[in-house]
Amino acid sequence: KISAHNIELVDAPVSGGPRGAREGTIAIIVGGSDHQFERVLKILKFISDNIIHAGTLGSGHSIKLGNNLLNLICRIGTFEVVSMLVKEGVEPSLAVSIIQKSSGRNYATEVTLPDNILSGKMNQGFSTALMEKDSSSALQIGVRHKLDMTLGKAAHTILKRTISEYGSAADISSVANYFENETGARIQPRKEV
């Protein structure tokens, strides 16, 4: 119906969080035809140079959802392993710095833990409610394609437990609190009393 009014639709979700927005490096993931992508490119360049054509309409949204589910899986796996290492007697900051220089590195070891958890800020700027929405939608894509999504479901379950404990408005960093409570391993710096 919108094409009758000479209006075209693309999807262009973003990924990279507040840090990417501040630094102008946020990824803009565009779904639409080649022609539509070329038309919106000059406008989107005002926001970021990191613009990717993902394919047809809807592809950008699907990739963003998949990316956020993968981020959740990596985050939870990283917190689980760091908790285990803390229980083993390794300082969390040392564990993270070594993992970051090794094959287990990921966004959680590069940004989440150093900038938000180990620093004590606990403010990544993305709510558990938004992550729940995106990861739930990504899992629905898996259901549509009859995929088991074992890791995604497990990560989503832990996220839902975190929301149950800390609320849907809590920052996604609160997943670290969940692991601290579950394992007794302190990842965050101790607060001065």
Report residues per predicted region.
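ATP-dependent carboxylate/acyl-activation modules
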Residues: 45, 189-193
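Helical "substrate-binding/catalytic lid" subdomain
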Residues: 59-182
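Rossmann-fold dinucleotide-binding core
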Residues: 1-72
